[in-house]
């Protein structure tokens, strides 16, 4: 079996998972601090997807911790395929939510009376954190997909 850095069961994967959780939590936190986020569908979508990404990554971080502690590589192709597909789905959803939230922030910024600068900055920072979550999620998916052929 080929050792791919960033694939399930490695310390690099654990780092990616923890990074995804922290960024998703930060995005969720900055979005929900704003009192009016529920008025915009894109912001509600971002909150929903980041709320979904946190337990997904927490579960896979526990799998990584288990594999790292036992020093066993993850060698189950079907489960790895399911994890890769799940990461890809979370990645696409995170990109869609980050893009839609960033678009709404740009529209709100053009009309300063509808969004005070401090609130718009929070929303923009939440969208930025969601983009970073997407990047780490895509990385995890690609690393696991890269490992998959060596297990089959």
From Swiss-Prot:
Organism placement in taxonomy: Eukaryota, Viridiplantae, Streptophyta, Embryophyta, Tracheophyta
Tissue: Expressed in the floral organ abscission zone and flower buds.
Xref: Pfam families: CASP_dom
Annotated family: Belongs to the Casparian strip membrane proteins (CASP) family.
Membrane association type: Multi-pass membrane protein
Protein name as annotated: CASP-like protein 5C3
Keywords carried by this UniProt record: Cell membrane, Glycoprotein, Membrane, Transmembrane, Transmembrane helix
Localization terms from the record: Cell membrane
PANTHER family linked to this entry: CASP-LIKE PROTEIN 5B3 (PTHR32021), CASP-LIKE PROTEIN 5C3 (PTHR32021:SF32)
KW Cell membrane (keyword) present: yes
Topological domains, Extracellular: 39-42, 100-128
UniProt subunit comment: Homodimer and heterodimers.
Originating species: Arabidopsis thaliana
């Amino acid at each position: 079996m080929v050792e791919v850095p960033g694939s399930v069961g490695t310390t690099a994967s654990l780092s990616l998972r923890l990074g995804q959780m922290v960024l998703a939590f930060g995005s969720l936190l900055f979005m929900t601090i704003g009192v009016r986020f529920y008025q915009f569908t894109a912001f509600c979508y971002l909150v929903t997807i980041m709320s979904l990404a946190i337990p997904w990554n927490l579960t896979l971080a526990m799998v990584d911790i288990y594999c790292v502690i036992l020093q066993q590589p993850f060698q189950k192709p079907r489960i790895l395929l399911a994890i890769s597909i799940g990461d890809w789905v979370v990645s696409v959803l995170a990109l869609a939510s980050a893009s839609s939230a960033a678009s709404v922030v740009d529209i709100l910024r053009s009309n300063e009376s509808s969004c005070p600068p401090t609130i718009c900055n929070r929303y923009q920072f939440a969208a930025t954190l969601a983009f970073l979550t997407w990047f780490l999620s895509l990385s995890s998916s690609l690393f696991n997909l890269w490992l998959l052929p060596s297990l089959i």
